[in-house]
Amino acid sequence: MHDHCAALLGDLDSVVREFSTLLSTSKRRRLPALTQETSRKSYESSSTADEFFDAEAGDLDRSQLVIIEHQSEEDTPGSDADEASIHSSSSVSSVGDDDKVFSSSPDNLHPGKPKSLIPLPLTDVVNRRATIPQATVQPPSLIAFVRKNVGKDLSTISMPVSANEPTSLLQRVAEQLEYAHLLDAAVKQKQPRDRLLYVTAFAVSQFSCSRVRERAMRKPFNPLLGETFELLRTQGETAGEGGIGGGFRLIVEKVSHRPVRLAMQADGLAWSFAQSPAPTQKFWGKSAELTTDGRVRVTLRLPDGTDERYSWAVATVFLRNVVMGEKYVEPVGSMAVSNDSSGARAAIEFRSRGMFGGRGEDVVVEVYGSDGSRDGSGLVGTWTGGLRISDQGKPSGPEIWKPGSLVPNAPNTYGMTTFAASLNEITPLEKGKLPATDCRLRPDQRLAEQGKLDEAEDWKVKLEEAQRSRRRVMEEKGQEYRPRWFVKAAAAQDGEEVWKLKGGKDGYWEERAKGTWTGVDDLFNV
């Protein structure tokens, strides 16, 4: 037994040495001089979280620049303070002369009420599936992957399909809308403070989709450029406790490939939600830091005819134990939900349990008035279990949010919620009405859901190569890609890149109603 353990330790030491050598070699080969702004050492992709793992995000003709520093969290002084004060940067690209550019005034960056809300309200009764087939294999080991590819450019190497859960990144960001009934409920509140609390509960609720640790073991499929996802929810599905129902509609599109950026807008009868998220990551030895550039903006359309505008930057999330051990994710530090109409705000603190305390789940919310004063109201609870109205930091009122159900046997079914499991299903609401770009129609993702991983792998390779071919053709012609459904707004004052949903005859929902899908590429026909 002693010899066996010694052999295992020897193999592990060898892998760690190879991993360190690979990172050090890649650093010397590609690393420019570091600026003094770097607060601590990390492995940082200059693009997105998915590009490290997906070959479709790499460019075979041009190596992607990555910054690699090999140093563990324990070796880095002040890492706890850094986690609480992380700010993501934005990436702004040029806009073609023919593109419509929206004003960057704060009000115009928020979503307005569309002229038409078709197909709302949705009163249909839809029987959605409550689960998907269980995973048939374990996800690959990162150590084994690195060991196998020592000396290679990792940005051009594709992880196998078994590293993915059978959903798209487009669907993952759509999970923010699982608790949209909180926005309906916010509109019904008479006091501005109460509306702020409901919107804040909605902002916190998005993290609950990762409460099962197995959800951290795999990543969603990286969408192709121009790939889309629409989501419709009916009146019965969104009524909720205190909600007004009527359902909502959502469209998400991948608008940029390098760096990956999505654009999304959801509309209910009395609210609109918009975001242009660009996920990025840094590796810190044992953990990965996941940040999202792109503020969430929500507009509530109040019964008196006025609009109330809110916004927030999504908190940083850490994926723990990346290389070995039990993986899990946790939001860290703080975030603030601002009432941009009044100046009031809600300060959210995600409380840490320390280096050896395990996952931090506690959440404390404090409300500040437009003059910066506190009135003692807020929320307490956990991002995994629910939030309750509080006074002076102690529970004093009803629970206004609790997470929804998980699929049966969630640990063996990708750790999914019931809501997430329903997203890749084509229901009567979508059948025959989806554009050719909708990720539900993507063959490799569908085959992966069915457990046919070898076939999914073949399709993934074909789709990636077709995307590279399209990009080469555009580069040869000197053309710039223009998204079909969103147009870039003028940069916000802080440089944030914001995309706005087109309306009128060029709008997604108008094209859907006609069923023509003008100017839509058949991305999956390869």
Locations of the language-model features?
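Extended acidic, Ser/Thr- and Pro-enriched interaction/regulatory segments
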Residues: M1-D184, K188, R193-V526
